[in-house]
Amino acid sequence: MRHAIPRRLEAPDLEWAVALLGQAMAAHPALSYVCAPPIGARRQHWLLRQLLDYVFRHGVAYTNAAGTALVLWLHPTELRRPWALQLRLLLPAIWWLGWAGSQRLRRLIRTVAWLRRQSLAGPHHLLLGVAVHPAAQGRGEGRRLLAATLALRQSPLPCYFSGQVPSQLAFYQGLGFELAGHCTVGEGPAGVLSNWGLLRPAARK
C-alpha cells in the first residue's frame, strides 16, 4: 500500500507545530503529571517548545498535507547520548516548572529511558509521539501519517515507542508494535502515571 509522502518540518514551522502539539496533548497524562497546577499554559508551552526544538536538532518531525497531525522521531545516533535531553531540559525546568515539576520531569525521562534499555539493546529508531489536532481526531490521519513515516525508515532497525495512554496501545499495535514492557513512573497530583514500552521489530531484508 502506497502512502502520501509526509512533509518534513523545518525551523519556520516550530511555533505552529508547538501550538498544534499543545492542543493535541492538552489532556495527555504525561503532560498533566509534569505540569500539574499551579503550572500554567505558558510553562506547558515552554516544555513542548523545548521538546520540539530538540527533535528539530536531533531527529525529524513530519506533518500531513492538511497540517493537522505530527509525528516525531529521534535519530538512532542521538540515542547514544541519553544525558543530552536531560541537560537541555532539567536545569531550566527548575525555573519554568518549579522544583516539584522539574523533579517529576526528571523522573519521567529517567523511567522511560530505563524501560527502553530493558526492552531492547542496540541501535533503533525512537518514536517520540503522534499528535493530531482535536478537530481532526477519529479520521485516521494519525495512523496514515505514522504509517507513511514508518515506510521512510531507511535502515532495517527496530522502532520503539513509550506510551502513557493505555487506550492508545491498540493503535500502535495495529501498526506492528508489540508490547515490550510496563512500569510505573510515579504518583502525581492527578494520580499514578504508568508507562508502556512498545517495540516494532526490525524489517526483514
Predicted features, each with a name:
Residues 38-60:
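Active-site rim helix/loop that mediates acceptor-substrate recognition in acyltransferases
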Residues 5-19, 27:
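A short beta-loop-alpha structural element at the N-terminal edge
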Residues 53-74:
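Conserved beta-hairpin
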Residues 19-38:
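Helix-loop element at the rim of GNAT/NAT acetyltransferase active sites that forms part
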Residues 143, 159, 165-183, 189-190:
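Conserved active-site alpha-helix within GNAT-family acetyltransferase domains
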Residues 72-131, 137, 186-191:
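Conserved acyl-donor/pantetheine-binding loop and adjacent beta-alpha core of acyl/acetyltransferases
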Residues 123-125, 152-164:
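Conserved GNAT acetyl-CoA-binding A-motif
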Residues 128-132, 138-151:
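Conserved acetyl-CoA-binding loop-helix of GNAT-fold acetyltransferases
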